[in-house]
């Protein structure tokens, strides 16, 4: 089982059978897993912040909201809705795709990057109860 399928199964255990978001280049493999997986539905929206607000509402009603966006530009655009969910203690899982750490070492000025790979994670630490970064060849 790869990480994408594992994450989908965990979301389902917490009551989420929908994932809101906007597919981006660093989330495409995960989005393919969502598309192929039975029992979970992707809900595309036109803006990342709208995906966050929709997932927040879904979490309040169903037990756990889930949203996926791409690295940096997508994650930065979802900050207000994530902060709102955090302030209201709303259960929300935010999945953000990113280039591998090895790739960022070779090409630190890759598109969608700001500062270094920890900048985004450091910002999320202030508006979430927990953050983690998963980096492996077989993840998504």
Give the role of each language-model region.
Residues 1-140:
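N-terminal alpha/beta PP-like core and its mobile active-site loop of ThDP/TPP-dependent enzymes
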């Amino acid at each position: 089982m790869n990480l994408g399928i594992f994450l989908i199964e965990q979301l389902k255990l917490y009551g989420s059978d929908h994932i809101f978001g906007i597919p981006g280049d660093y989330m495409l493999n995960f989005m393919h897993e969502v598309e192929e997986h039975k029992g979970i539905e992707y809900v595309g929206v036109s803006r990342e912040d709208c995906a966050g607000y929709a997932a927040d509402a879904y979490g309040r009603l169903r037990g756990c909201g889930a949203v996926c966006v791409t690295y940096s530009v997508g994650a930065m655009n979802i900050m207000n809705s994530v902060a709102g969910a955090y302030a209201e203690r709303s259960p929300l899982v935010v999945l953000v795709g990113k280039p591998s750490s090895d790739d960022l070492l070779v090409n630190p000025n890759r598109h969608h990057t700001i500062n270094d790979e920890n900048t985004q994670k450091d910002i999320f630490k202030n508006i979430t109860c927990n953050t983690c970064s998963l980096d492996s060849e077989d993840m998504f």
